Design a protein with these regions (language model features):
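Thiamine diphosphate
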Residues: 2-129, 151, 160-291, 295, 305-511, 516, ...
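A short alpha/beta connector and helix-capping loop motif
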Residues: 139-162, 434, 438, 443, ...
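Short, glycine-rich nucleotide/cofactor-binding loops
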Residues: 133-138, 330-332
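Short glycine/serine/threonine-rich phosphate/pyrophosphate-binding segments
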Residues: 32-33, 106-110, 137-145, 166-167, ...
Length: 670
């Protein structure tokens, strides 16, 4: 406890001297944190800490030197290589999963981590602990994680460290009644323990009871520990702006660094001189470590892109470029997705499919009497029947938890394939995708990775979908570093790209256009169980000499129809059509080669025209291929509005064949 506090104090001094760049302390939380660390088995149990958990991770084995290396942002920082702020703990060896700044986002990931324990080691008694302040319990992910953990009796210990303040907002303005543990009364399977988190002895008893409950696989447990916060939230905050002198005096009186030494002396377990010698030794060691760490080298220039993706498995390489071995009759795109999932589940027991309505039937006793659901589009039909309910199961309607759970499972080495039912409903999971899943490898300096494949149905051209079943917006996700984004236009590509997504080691957003699921024109015989298509390799679906159309998804077929019309009018001027297939990364060489041949380019996509995916391609063509162009770069996209319900509205809003023809004729007239 004293070591944790002295590191806080030393960092505060360094920040005031401008020798480090940020500081947040765990002062006042030391007793409950050390108790939690003593109840766990380092390197066996798993921990999702938050930024105040300095004493917890120290008790698990993180060294003071590691902490100071992170504070100065050194290349030798074992948690992140200088990429994360201080107090963002990470240690693969100690099973301390890399943390992030968004409060509460760790909850749903811890559900997946604890779920993985039950799946990978059913006979083991390992547990997962997730920690937060009381303010984070206002986040939706907290409630989603509790719901999931209680439903499945997941061995997960929630540690809520309640110091009474979420920066400047007191508990009574965060939680109805001011007590999170009181609100949770009635959650089935959940053990609730409320404890004075500044009392080490009581804290140890509480943590031991909670951990033992989870080890016995009786369900999740929650410890609500009342702490104190004798320092400001961080050095960016001044608590005197919202705390009275009396508030601050009361908190100081409950400081565990005063209470615990006094208790040791009163119980005859130590004398004041012995305690002082220990504290003096800690102070001396802290000073020595600080002086040494301040000389540490910063991250190397040129290392910023390192570990953005896996550096051992490259899905853009020739290893992922195989030839099809066609089998059977032509199949629809949705059938190919279903078969590819089944083949990969058979090949690799780590592959697990879950989401809303993906299972055949949640009530297993009914499986012999019903046909089964298997997804609203039948993409997962039969997978539960073939592989069991542990490998294909339904979840609550909670998109953040679906993605976060998958992230936690992937950290443990599983290959989760969650489904988001409609692209229009992916937004509750946005923080989990952008701030967590996509940057886990980068922010942990390759310490952790999360190769999740998120399947999502996307797009319009199905009458009646309207605002919430017909939108696109893929450009939002192609703007996220570390995330692969794929969108096949036909059954054959869906098979090869989905298999690559599952076998690669990066997170992938796999976009499945709803209109293309059962079209007759994009069917293909099955390409075999080892057919792979590398990411970033486009397909020239039609060669031409006078105009290049760069497109993907549902616009591929519409581009073919437009080209047919144009070439009927002038057979000597033909249109080349490039299906990108993969949006991040994309095949720039294919675009460059085609544009240098045709000297004209039209970029077409279904999403809104303004700030759409085509804007980046058009800008790069204009920037790098200007000398090859005989006409401006043109774009076709949807109107800058929402997709309407009535078919006439939808047809007006979404790009049609006539829109492609009009722009193509304008370019060909130059």
């Amino acid at each position: 406890m004293h070591t944790s506090r002295r590191i806080d104090d030393r960092e505060i001094l360094l920040k005031r001297q401008s020798r480090i760049f940020f500081q947040v302390s765990g002062a006042g939380h030391e007793a409950i944190q050390v108790a939690a660390g003593m109840a766990l088995r380092p390197g066996f149990d798993w921990v999702y800490p938050y930024y105040r958990d300095r004493a917890l991770v120290l008790s698990l084995g993180v060294s003071p030197e590691d902490m100071f290396l992170q504070a100065v942002g050194a290349a030798a920082d074992r948690a992140s290589g200088g990429r994360q702020m201080p107090s963002h703990w990470s240690s693969p060896e100690l099973h301390i999963v890399t943390g992030s700044s968004p409060t509460g986002s760790q909850f749903v990931q811890s559900v997946g981590c604890a779920h993985a324990s039950s799946y990978l080691h059913p006979a083991s008694d390992e547990v997962t602990l997730v920690s937060s302040g009381e303010g984070a319990t206002s986040e939706g992910e907290f409630w989603e994680s509790l719901n999931a953990a209680c439903l499945d009796k997941i061995p997960l210990v929630f540690l809520v460290q309640d110091n009474g303040w979420a920066i400047s907002v007191p508990s009574e303005r965060q939680t109805p009644g001011g007590s999170i543990s009181a609100l949770l009364e009635g959650f089935p399977q959940l053990l609730r323990i409320e404890v004075d988190g500044t009392d080490f002895v009581a804290s140890y008893a509480a943590m031991r009871e909670a951990v033992d409950y989870c080890r016995a696989r009786r369900g999740p447990a929650l410890v609500h520990a009342h702490c104190t916060r004798p320092y400001s939230h961080s050095l960016s905050d001044d608590e005197r702006l919202y705390k009275t002198d009396m508030d601050r005096a009361r908190e100081a009186a409950r400081d565990p660094l005063l209470r615990y030494p006094a208790w040791l002396v009163s119980e005859g377990l130590a004398d004041e001189r012995a305690l002082q010698r220990i504290m003096d030794e800690v102070d001396r060691e802290t000073q020595e470590i600080t002086e040494r760490v301040l000389r540490a080298e910063p991250p190397e220039r040129g290392s910023a892109l390192k570990y953005l993706y896996s550096e051992t498995v490259d899905p853009t390489s020739s290893e992922f470029d195989t030839q099809p071995v066609f089998l059977g009759d032509p199949r629809t795109m949705v059938d190919e997705i279903n078969l590819t999932l089944a083949e990969e589940m058979k090949r690799d027991s780590r592959v697990i499919v879950f989401g809303e309505d993906v299972a055949d039937c949640s009530r297993e006793q009914n499986l012999l009497e019903v046909k089964g659901k298997g997804g609203v589009f039948k993409a997962t039909a039969g997978l539960q029947m073939k592989f069991g309910s542990k490998r294909c199961f339904n979840t609550p309607i909670a998109e953040a938890c679906i993605v976060g759970r998958a992230t936690g499972m992937a950290v443990r080495g599983l290959k989760p394939i969650p489904e988001i039912q409609f692209f229009d409903y992916i937004w509750p999971a946005m923080m989990q995708i952008r701030d967590e899943l996509a940057n886990i490898r980068w922010r942990s300096n390759n310490g952790f990775s999360a190769p999740v494949v998120i399947r999502v149905a996307i797009g319009g051209y199905l009458n009646g979908g309207a605002i919430y079943h017909s939108q696109c917006g893929e450009v939002v996700f192609t703007h996220i570093p570390g995330l692969r984004v794929v969108m096949p236009s036909n059954a054959l590509d869906a098979c090869g790209l989905l298999r690559t997504a599952i076998r690669c080691e990066d997170p992938v957003l796999f976009l499945e256009h709803k209109r293309l699921y059962r079209e007759p024109y994009n069917r293909s015989p099955h390409a075999g169980p080892d057919y792979l298509i590398p990411f970033g390799k486009a397909k020239v679906v039609k060669p031409g000499n006078a105009l290049t159309i760069v497109t993907y998804g549902a616009l591929v077929q519409k581009s073919l129809q437009a080209a047919m019309y144009l070439e009927q009018r002038d057979p000597n001027r033909t249109v080349e059509i490039i299906d990108l297939r993969c949006l991040s990364p994309y095949d720039w060489e294919a675009i460059r080669t085609s544009v240098e041949k045709t000297s004209r380019v039209l970029v077409a996509h279904e999403d809104c025209l303004s700030w759409g995916y085509g804007a980046e391609l058009a800008a790069r063509v204009a920037d790098e291929l200007f000398g090859s162009l005989d006409a401006p770069v043109a774009r076709v996209g949807a109107l800058d509005t929402w997709v309407g319900y009535h078919p006439q509205l939808e047809n007006e809003i979404l790009p049609q064949v006539d829109d492609l023809i009009k722009q193509a004729e304008r370019l060909l007239a130059y």
